[in-house]
Design a protein with these regions (language model features):
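Short intrinsically disordered terminal tails
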Residues: 1, 110-119
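Aromatic-residue detector
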Residues: 36-37, 115
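Cys/His-rich zinc-coordinating "finger/knuckle" motifs
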Residues: 12-16, 45-48
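Short cysteine-rich loop/turn motifs with clustered Cys
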Residues: 1-15, 40
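Short recognition patches in nucleic-acid-associated and regulatory proteins
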Residues: 13-26
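Short, charged/polar surface micro-motifs in flexible loops or helix N-caps
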Residues: 11, 22, 42-44
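Polybasic, low-complexity binding patches
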Residues: 25-35, 43-109
């Protein structure tokens, strides 16, 4: 399918990337923790999701945020499903206390130099 790559924003033929792969791939699918990436961002480029630990970490952070907001999970509930926490305590506090001025739906967080992800 053609569409906009989640990472680079280019209009390309897209591939589905499971944010949490391996043994956690089925649960990643169950909770909609997938993104559509162009082949470069998915597997070809040195900075792609499958070749760069930094890119994988960025997507893990996005996936945890998405799961915690959509499922209304605590950090502990996320860890029970996915085995690890990827967010810092301030981000977790904001998710777990949505009525305290944190806008989970439209907040943009600077994750890396110049990279904005919608979560």
């Amino acid at each position: 399918m053609k569409g906009i790559c989640f990472l680079c924003g280019n209009y390309e033929q897209l591939e589905e990337h499971h944010i949490f792969g391996g043994a956690r791939r089925p649960i990643s699918t169950k909770y909609g923790l997938t993104v559509h990436l162009c082949p470069w961002c998915h597997r070809i480029d040195a900075d792609s999701a499958h070749r760069s630990g930094e890119t994988a970490e960025l997507l893990h952070r996005y996936g945890q945020h998405k799961a915690m907001v959509e499922q209304r999970w605590s950090k502990e509930e996320f860890i029970a499903h996915f085995g690890k926490n990827y967010l810092d305590e301030a981000e977790i506090w904001g998710i777990e206390h949505p009525d305290d001025g944190w806008d989970n739906e439209s907040a943009f967080h600077l994750i890396e130099e110049g990279v904005l992800l919608p979560f």
